[in-house]
């Protein structure tokens, strides 16, 4: 059984800490066995993965609909759903073996979480999940691609929240112009969980502003970037 960082985990998950523990055990066992998590990550599972994901709940309002793009083993979506049961969390993942893992975990933990197999750039996914309040991601792709995938899923003024590493400011500088051309506004780097984690999680936040950018991308013949 994996051991949580007691004070931080208790503060973040409260009475749902047992659910977080069960999810961490899923990651440490089936997650490793199925190749969704490297075995070397087990010893730092809580601070690097579970808590690092859950703390971005600081940036989400009550009852918001949140799409986790490229959810993989459920990060950051499942820790968010456990810590914030008020959120409407959708896990979006294209690979069948990962979708099956996510469905098993959601069922076992009794979470009100939707698992969708697909890619963010697919028209059917955009039609199904468009108008969401937030699109979250973790270790999925560079910011230009994340913006292409995230903006069409968001309502006007919705937010993209991308968990990144210490190079986040450099990546923002590199991709800001492309991001803004795709409809992203107020792009900034925000630390999350400073009261619980050292270092805190680093999150790139961008608001969906000009709706013309994302809408142009629905048709691959138009300028503005067809889905990658």
From Swiss-Prot:
Residues 207-228 are annotated as: Disordered. The keyword Transferase applies. S-adenosyl-L-methionine binds at residues 70, 75, 120-121, 138. Its main location: cytoplasm. It is found in: Cytoplasm. Its EC number is 2.1.1.-. One of its GO terms (cellular component) is cytosol. It is an enzyme of class 2 (transferase). It holds the Pfam family GidB. Keywords: Cytoplasm, Methyltransferase, rRNA processing, S-adenosyl-L-methionine, Transferase. GO terms for molecular function: rRNA (guanine-N7-)-methyltransferase activity. Specifically methylates the N7 position of guanine in position 518 of 16S rRNA. Belongs to the methyltransferase superfamily. RNA methyltransferase RsmG family. This is Ribosomal RNA small subunit methyltransferase G.
